Amino acid sequence: MSTETELQVAVKTSAKKDSRKKGQDRSEATLIKRFKGEGVRYKAKLIGIDEVSAARGDKLCQDSMMKLKGVVAGARSKGEHKQKIFLTISFGGIKIFDEKTGALQHHHAVHEISYIAKDITDHRAFGYVCGKEGNHRFVAIKTAQAAEPVILDLRDLFQLIYELKQREELEKKAQKDKQCEQAVYQTILEEDVEDPVYQYIVFEAGHEPIRDPETEENIYQVPTSQKKEGVYDVPKSQPVSAVTQLELFGDMSTPPDITSPPTPATPGDAFLPAPSQTLPGSADVFGSMSFGTAAVPSGYVAMGAVLPSFWGQQPLVQQQIAMGAQPPVAQVIPGAQPIAWGQPGLFPATQQPWPTVAGQFPPAAFMPTQTVMPLPAAMFQGPLTPLATVPGTNDSARSSPQSDKPRQKMGKEMFKDFQMAQPPPVPSRKPDQPSLTCTSEAFSSYFNKVGVAQDTDDCDDFDISQLNLTPVTSTTPSTNSPPTPAPRQSSPSKSSASHVSDPTADDIFEEGFESPSKSEEQEAPDGSQASSTSDPFGEPSGEPSGDNISPQDGS
């Protein structure tokens, strides 16, 4: 027994000396050898384990230590003692074994230990916080010797593990960089690219290497994947959509006019001739015209669709009855040079703006825009046809200085069955205005063959084809004497079969807004008298001659 006791004492003293030497040597190699395998073993007693709310904190650890010591004091009064253990410190963490049985009681890995605290009241006691997030526990241990060497070993272990981890990460990163660099230069050699530096940058960025940097344009060219609708791309042409009345004028307050021809579906159709509805014979006789006019919506005082006319003027037929306006009728100027059918006027037709209130149309809004001379009288020997009843006028009548002379009028018998609003009165003409008298027998015979002139107040274009002309005679043979108006008779007959006006009633549009209370004035045509200031060929001014006669425009 004595020999065994001596051997144990000698081992203890040698272990103490070795621990001191090891404690003094804190090199990395020594620490690795020290904590390798089973590690360092210490004899101690377990005070207890308490659950805490946080992972670290001195006050937290001290409070938990005092609490566990109080529990142990209560158990000692009952005859219970602290459990004897021995703990090992290694790379695997802290392991607690039972001294009697040698069984493993607790094992806490290094990454689970978050805080180590020393008891300020007892130099042989210490504790550490371990556990995962939300499940932290404080382990209190009382060593057989001073607790400082155990705390220092734990500190060295943590520091060594941290340094080894950092070194390992650096080595892995260096190895990865080396592998990447080798792969990059291997790719450069295979692809035979001229710019290896740029190739390296592209490879590191994760893009594909440039295949063909042959020209300088490839460097500044925008990739196809980045081209968008805008700066680098030509904007695509948008298809022309159909234009409707609602799109042009918005929501109309009044229903559209269903009697007028439909609006062209596309902008290109606006220049095509519209279907002939008001002049049945015009399209068949003279063919399709070159220009058409789209209908105006009824919400903006629509006057009906303007059909293409071979006279260059724009007749408004259907809705002018409701608005108090009269259809235009081309004036016949005897003695002038005839103009071919469909020949455009010397002065372009002018589109007058539509008024927004009925009855407020200016007199010049419906002026004829083209002059068409009458055909020879021999063409009218047979029965009247719509072909010879639609002559027009040119702008010479509009530019005549005698525009204030009296106009021809018609009676109201034609519209006695219609209920319409009367147009606003126009100031009466001067009584001293001269009238035009024509003494040409050819012109008189022409009127005998054509028909009778009609009044223009509230006249409708549906009845113009039924008018008859009465012969008028010259009352003044002199070409210098003022003309006298010839009386006109109105025909009460109405017919909707023909919508073509007579050649002598071509100023119906000019006469539509004059007062119905005016006295009828007579006008007799004179084939040898001329008072026009502008001939059909564009001469703005000239002296009266016996070959041309200018129609008189209303004020």
Curated annotation (Swiss-Prot):
Phosphorylated by FYN on Tyr-198 and Tyr-220 upon reelin induction in embryonic neurons. Also phosphorylated on Ser-491 independently of reelin signaling. Ubiquitinated by various cullin-5-RING E3 ubiquitin-protein ligase complexes (ECS complexes) following ligand-binding and phosphorylation, leading to its degradation. Ubiquitinated by the ECS(SOCS7) complex in the cortical plate of the developing cerebral cortex following ligand-binding and phosphorylation by FYN, leading to its degradation by the proteasome. Recognized by ZSWIM8 through a disorder targets misorder mechanism that eliminates misfolded DAB1 via ubiquitination and proteasomal degradation. Its main location: cytoplasm. One of its GO terms (molecular function) is phosphatidylinositol 3-kinase binding. InterPro entries: DAB1/2_SBM, Dab_PTB, PH-like_dom_sf, PTB/PI_dom. PROSITE patterns: PID (PS01179). GO terms for biological process: adult walking behavior; astrocyte differentiation; axonogenesis; cell adhesion; cell surface receptor signaling pathway via JAK-STAT; cell-cell adhesion involved in neuronal-glial interactions involved in cerebral cortex radial glia guided migration; cerebellum structural organization; cerebral cortex cell migration. It comes from the Eukaryota. This is Disabled homolog 1. It comes from Rattus norvegicus.
